[in-house]
Amino acid sequence: MQTIALAVIGGTGVYTLSQFDDVQVYEVETLYGRPSGPIRVGMLFGQRVAFFARHGEEHALPPHKINYRANIAALQQLGVSRVLALNTVGGINEAFGPRTLVCPDQLIDYTWGRVSTFCEEVGSEVLHVDFGHPYSPLLRGCLLRAARDVDVSLVEYGCYGVTQGPRLETIAEIDRLRRDGCDLVGMTGMPEAALAREKGLEYACLGIVSNWAAGCGDGAEITMGEILSNVATAFSCLPELISKVARE
């Protein structure tokens, strides 16, 4: 197989890549089971890119039921070394309103009960990986440069609070996240980032703010219609940005 320049993991509302040509579909089996769906490899503005939808192509997998280990292992089996994760998130900080694109540099994990490491098999090596900077500085740098080159507005920092889901958070829970220093809230950032680190992959997050978190902004009720509409609007500029990252 030809070298894959970049793998993209699609989040809520992102189930395919537009302008994706010469696509081949791979059904990958791993030691940890099957990934969320088939992995599609094709050309995006001249760059060879892999893509799959984290929640499945029909959005059938809630955040706590995603086989994160199989997803990361499948990408590694295809020879992927760089992963750009698209995460649909809610805005807590007033600078992170709906339709904002964000490249977070930190996260806090509030999830529980998810299989969060590859170090579980008998005889496997125990890895105490450095996770002080949970996102690859190298790939984050590529993303930030690419955004400037294609004139895409991107917030260049942020702390992503990862909650269990699938329900949205209470106002009190969001107040707690704010006090903890979180700018964004979502449900799929972990254990994905940590598993990628264990496998030695360069991994970065591109957050798509779909709505204000509970009690933030105008305080209106959050609906799936609002979330999907805002993701679609924000995503319109991303194929060119993704191809630019792949080219870096």
From Swiss-Prot:
The record marks E169, M224 as: Important for substrate specificity. SUPFAM superfamilies: Purine and uridine phosphorylases (SSF53167). The keyword Coiled coil does not apply. It catalyses: S-methyl-5'-thioinosine + phosphate = 5-(methylsulfanyl)-alpha-D-ribose 1-phosphate + hypoxanthine. Disulfide bonds: none annotated. It is an enzyme of class 2 (transferase). One of its GO terms (molecular function) is S-methyl-5-thioadenosine phosphorylase activity. GO terms for biological process: L-methionine salvage from methylthioadenosine; purine ribonucleoside salvage. InterPro entries: MTAP, Nucleoside_phosphorylase_d, Nucleoside_phosphorylase_sf, Purine_phosphorylase-2_CS. NCBIfam families: PRK09136.1. Belongs to the PNP/MTAP phosphorylase family. MTAP subfamily. Homotrimer. Although this enzyme belongs to the family of MTA phosphorylases based on sequence homology, it has been shown that conserved amino acid substitutions in the substrate binding pocket convert the substrate specificity of this enzyme from 6-aminopurines to 6-oxopurines. This is Probable S-methyl-5'-thioinosine phosphorylase. It comes from Xylella fastidiosa (strain Temecula1 / ATCC 700964).
